[in-house]
């Protein structure tokens, strides 16, 4: 009996943990932390580091849980998402919504009183943008859903920055622009790989409505746009040579994968491009930090 009870409790905890989409939130929090560190020349304020990260993570997890609730019919059709807790009946809608609401309330309270009101309101706007505007409306309405809804997912570095400064800085907006340009090739590569599942679920992703060839061209075009956007921190003097070299190398590799998709020259290029896009964003933001803390001068 003791082992059975322990297993049941552990399974319940894991279900709620899965509702938070921890891997997605972890990548978002990396970009938020980079925003914080780039904004702080005189040392990191403890309230921004601890409370800021906690509040942003809680609201991001709330948005993820709401996404599980809203998308459960779509998730039930797609192989990638069929085992999610709500689809499997391990967590019902009421408990999931209560969980999401609780995370949002606690997260807002932490940000509003422990960090600053601007960060709280911007983070709430990001939650609404992703969980309501994108998930509830755009995802089902237009093949440009990822483009139009991408701003909400691009916000974390701005949220991290404002948690330190309490203001919206142009440099933070450059980081938002990079993620905004990164979002379409990232998701469209997955959509090409999962085209049949999206079609079966009735989601008008670009490959479903316009075909693979059209989508691959736009992946290439947006990757070029991303490459240009990634150069802006160096061009504007925000970052130095370490970042420039890293962004150049990472960007050329991303373009190589986008070109391979366009030319159909590599097996499984779509899913490999999707996976590389995650590595790309992680390493690009690590390069931002390395450049910030390692002084390099060329004479």
Swiss-Prot record:
GO terms for molecular function: protoheme IX farnesyltransferase activity. This is Protoheme IX farnesyltransferase. It is a multi-pass membrane protein. It catalyses: heme b + (2E,6E)-farnesyl diphosphate + H2O = Fe(II)-heme o + diphosphate. PANTHER family: 4-HYDROXYBENZOATE SOLANESYLTRANSFERASE (PTHR43448:SF7), PROTOHEME IX FARNESYLTRANSFERASE, MITOCHONDRIAL (PTHR43448). Pathway: Porphyrin-containing compound metabolism; heme O biosynthesis; heme O from protoheme: step 1/1. One of its GO terms (cellular component) is plasma membrane. It is found in: Cell inner membrane. GO terms for biological process: heme O biosynthetic process. Belongs to the UbiA prenyltransferase family. Protoheme IX farnesyltransferase subfamily. Carbon 2 of the heme B porphyrin ring is defined according to the Fischer nomenclature. Its EC number is 2.5.1.141. Converts heme B (protoheme IX) to heme O by substitution of the vinyl group on carbon 2 of heme B porphyrin ring with a hydroxyethyl farnesyl side group. Pfam families: UbiA. Keywords: Cell inner membrane, Cell membrane, Heme biosynthesis, Membrane, Transferase, Transmembrane, Transmembrane helix. InterPro entries: Protohaem_IX_farnesylTrfase, UbiA_prenyltransferase, UbiA_prenylTrfase_CS, UbiA_sf. The chain crosses the membrane at residues 24-44, 46-66, 94-114, 118-138, 146-166, 172-192, 232-252, 278-298.
